[in-house]
UniProtKB/Swiss-Prot annotation:
Residues 1-29 form the signal peptide. One of its GO terms (biological process) is L-arabinose metabolic process. It is an enzyme of class 3 (hydrolase). It comes from Streptomyces chartreusis. Alpha-L-arabinofuranose binds at E58, C247, N379, E380. Residues 70-215 form the CBM-cenC domain. The active site is at E380. This is Extracellular exo-alpha-L-arabinofuranosidase. Keywords: Carbohydrate metabolism, Glycosidase, Hydrolase, Secreted, Signal. It is found in: Secreted. Its EC number is 3.2.1.55.
Length: 825
């Protein structure tokens, strides 16, 4: 496809210095670090695909219902249940005045829409919407619809109101006979964030699919998308949209929604449930703790991808559950059905309107194919062998019928470890075209791992970085991600696709942080991370121009810090703690025969000395850290005996503890007791240094030993060496990449300065002939700055810089991402 990324980037800016918005290139600070960048314009770097950067949409944090899907009524079909959330009932978000009950009987609207509301004569029902209520704006129009039936004539009075009174003139709808769809339109007379939709019946009536949509949806489409959110996604100019998940895809039952399955309400995301008339789409529980109406379904995802010029990239379940469930489904008939469903999905997307599933697409309003080229099977499976056995069967069936489709595999939920290594081995041996990697790590990890893909096999499977983020929405997180993205671009011959995750978060329904775009029922705002993604996506270029920069020296000095004990959703007893210096001197010894006065409780949970052990008894509490010792300790051996008493996981044994946000810990039996890892926390964000599969037994005492020497750590479990690592990789704050825009001829010099010092930089363009004035876009802010609904400290500033030659000096502001567009002559 042909897309012009630059138009919303630096090329769109007026060529004027933005006075007061960004530090000028000649600014000097007391704290300045000198760097150099050397560009080789004659060398040919990696080509960058149009689709390199994209977005990943998953219905998490109410991203769909109550978010991108513009429906204003919550629980419009009375289908909420305890399968979705233990607090839910079929009348969640509704209040009945008079008599009314939700019924599941043969009088329903259709077989796949099981519930409806039976409303008594003279009664009414009121919906509260999402967040604080239904948002309406003065002068704007809203479309109401309802499926209803009545044995005798009944008049429905439909009203929009809030605590202060009416929000629009009420409408009346005459209902008589069997199920039929009725419509009305409102024009809001006031603006309110706390609206309610009320439906009153003068005689008995049955109601289902009670709906209210703003007329002003994205592209004015029916069953459409919330305009501001869709426009923010479109403004990124993503090369692809990965959907619908995520953990939604590969968790829950793999059965369908039918009488044969008992109308299974906790299913994996199965695309056929989500197409066709919305009143016939089978509701489902959401892995993240609420309900999915599927009003936003596969057709809408494909349509939105097409509308924004992005490649659709759907993900289908592989019949191996992940996200902590970790179960392989052994049912050959069910596997064959899912494989056929996947073939049918390709037909739905690409088949002619005369084909079975192409006809469904055409009847929904899109006779032309959606041009699907990539499809992913599975998501973050922790059972690589079982997953890959099924993946190969999916791939063989797809290649036999649709050889032009790229079938994407994955490498599990982490950036390293046994599962990751096994998955990659299987993918390489089977000549898989593309492998999806996922990781969520600390900003420090992203600064340390800019070179991650430098050593990947150029002839092996290509990488799809389908999910990544640096565990926060502060500017320091955006800086670290920007630094990492320069490495992604530099390795564009290996990394073909990359998308930040998650995309959207409703601030009143949060299951996961950080997120790219935040919103409530009245507004939406860009995170600092969004501004980074937008800057890169709109200024990609078509080819890497090789360049080099001076770097930070390797880390020196030993690992220093006290020791700690912690738990995560687990009750644990610790005993016989001993810390010994390298020369044999005892630094700490505690058998808890007395009290725990040597320990400082800095986390959650409930600690006490019981029967000569230090016990954490709250099996629901997370990060229950207690610390002991001196933060200046180095070169020591830590021994502790640990016994799991109850709960979901195992032990957390910390070392190198500087404070509550900076430490290492050995996480034994983490991730719902499926694997163990060493994690490093830097300023509160954690990154994984080492992982292995394994679990911890309840009631068994384990001997745990950690040996720290310099920057090398060796770990022993029950006297056997478990693993080790050397933490000597610098968190490089200065990163760069240079690309060329073939259409404009511009060289785009992209520099990240993730430190509180300016970076005075000598830039050598290697003889390239360029115009004397550069167009500049800068993101700069305090490292802890966070964009909110009312304040956006991280906002792009545009300017020009004069004095560009083939060798010039530019001072990059502290804590900044800067793109220089240099016009070649």
């Amino acid at each position: 496809m042909s897309r012009i990324r630059w138009r919303y980037g630096t090329a769109a800016t007026a060529l004027l210095v933005a006075a007061g918005l960004v530090p000028t290139a000649t600014a000097h600070a007391e704290d300045v670090t000198d760097y150099s960048i050397t560009v080789d314009p004659a060398a040919k770097g990696a080509a960058i695909d149009d689709t390199m950067y994209g977005v990943f949409f998953e219905d998490i944090n109410r991203a769909a219902d109550g978010g991108l899907y513009a429906e204003l009524v919550q629980n419009r079909s009375f289908e909420y249940s305890t399968d979705d959330n233990r607090s839910y009932t079929p009348l969640t978000s509704w209040i009945v005045d008079g008599t009314g009950e939700v019924v599941n009987d043969a009088g329903r609207l259709n077989e796949r829409n099981r519930n409806y509301l039976s409303l008594g004569a003279g009664s009414s029902v009121t919906n509260a919407g999402y967040n604080t209520g239904i948002r309406v704006e003065q002068g704007k129009r809203y479309d109401f619809s309802v499926w209803a039936r009545a044995g005798s004539a009944s008049t429905l009075t439909v009203a929009l109101k809030d605590a202060a009174g009416t929000l629009a003139t009420a409408r009346q709808v005459a209902v008589e006979g069997g199920w039929a769809k009725y419509r009305a339109t409102f024009t809001a007379t006031r603006t309110s964030n706390r609206g309610r939709l009320a439906v009153a019946a003068n005689d008995a009536a049955a109601l289902d699919m009670v709906s209210l949509f703003p007329r002003d949806t994205y592209r004015n489409q029916q069953n459409g998308l919330r305009k501001d959110l869709a426009e923010k996604i479109a403004a990124l100019h993503p090369g692809f949209v990965r959907f619908p998940g995520g953990c939604l895809v590969n968790t829950g039952s793999m059965e369908d929604y039918s009488a044969a399955s008992g109308w299974q309400r906790k299913r994996s995301y199965q695309w056929k449930d989500t197409v066709g008339p919305v009143e016939e789409r089978a509701t489902n529980a959401n892995f993240w703790g609420y309900n999915q109406s599927y009003g936003l379904g596969y057709y809408e995802y494909f349509r939105f991808s097409e509308d924004i010029g992005a490649m659709p990239l759907p993900v289908v379940p592989a019949l191996v559950t992940g996200c902590g469930q970790n179960k392989a489904v052994d049912d050959e008939a069910l596997l064959k059905r899912h494989i056929q469903d996947t073939l049918d999905l390709i037909e739905f997307a690409n088949g002619p309107a005369t084909s079975k599933w192409g006809k469904v697409r055409a009847e929904m309003g899109h006779p032309r194919p959606f041009r699907l080229t990539h499809l992913e099977v599975g998501n973050e499976e922790n059972l690589p062998d079982e997953f890959f056995d099924r993946f190969k069967q999916f791939r063989a069936a797809i290649e036999a019928e649709y050889p032009d489709i790229t079938v994407v595999s994955n490498s599990g939920p982490d950036d390293a470890g046994t599962t990751f290594d096994t998955a990659w081995k299987l993918n390489r041996e089977a000549n898989v075209e593309m492998v999806d990697e996922h990781y969520y790590n600390s900003p420090n990890w992203f600064l340390q791992n800019n070179d991650r893909y430098d050593s990947y096999d150029r002839g092996g499977p290509k990488v799809f970085l389908g999910e990544y983020a640096s565990q926060g929405n502060a500017w320091k997180n955006g800086l670290s991600e920007a630094a990492f993205m320069t490495g992604l671009e530099r390795n564009a011959d290996v990394v073909k696709l990359a998308s930040y995750a998650p995309l959207l978060a409703n601030e009143d329904y949060v299951q996961w942080r950080p997120d790219l775009v935040w919103f409530n029922n009245r507004a939406s705002w860009n995170s600092a991370n969004y501004e980074v993604q937008k800057l890169f996506m709109n200024n990609v270029g078509d080819r890497v121009v090789p360049s080099k920069a001076t770097t930070t020296p390797d880390v020196s000095g030993p690992i220093t810090g006290a020791v700690g004990l912690s738990t995560w959703a687990t009750g644990t007893a610790y005993d016989d703690v001993k810390v010994t210096a390298a020369d044999g001197a005892t630094l700490l010894s505690d058998d808890f025969s007395g009290d725990a006065s040597k320990w400082t409780h800095t986390g959650a949970g409930s600690w006490s000395v019981q029967d000569g052990q230090y016990v954490q008894t709250d099996a629901a509490a997370e990060n229950t850290m207690v610390q002991a010792g001196d933060p200046s300790w180095h070169d020591y051996d830590l021994h502790v005996k640990a016994t799991k008493k109850s709960g979901k996981e195992g032990f957390l044994v910390a070392f190198g503890v500087k404070d509550t946000g900076n430490y290492y810990w050995w996480n034994l039996g983490g991730w719902n007791n499926t694997q163990s890892a060493v994690e490093q926390a830097v300023d509160g964000g954690k990154g994984t240094l080492l992982t292995k599969a394994g679990s911890i037994e309840t009631g068994r005492a384990y001997d745990i030993d950690v040996k720290v020497r310099g920057r090398q750590v060796t770990l022993y479990l029950d006297g056997q060496e478990w693993g080790g690592f050397t933490d000597d990789k610098p968190a490089e704050p200065f990163r760069q990449v240079v690309t060329k825009d073939a259409r404009t001829g511009d060289l785009i010099v992209k520099v990240v300065n993730a430190q509180p010092a300016e970076a005075r930089t000598a830039i050598d363009l290697g003889g390239a002939r360029v115009a004397s004035t550069a167009r500049v876009t800068t993101l700069a802010a305090d490292q802890d700055a966070v964009n909110t609904e009312t304040d956006a400290p991280v906002t792009p500033a545009t300017s020009t810089f004069s004095g560009v030659t083939d060798r010039f000096t530019y001072t990059f502001p502290a804590n900044s991402v800067t793109f220089l567009r240099l016009k070649q002559r």
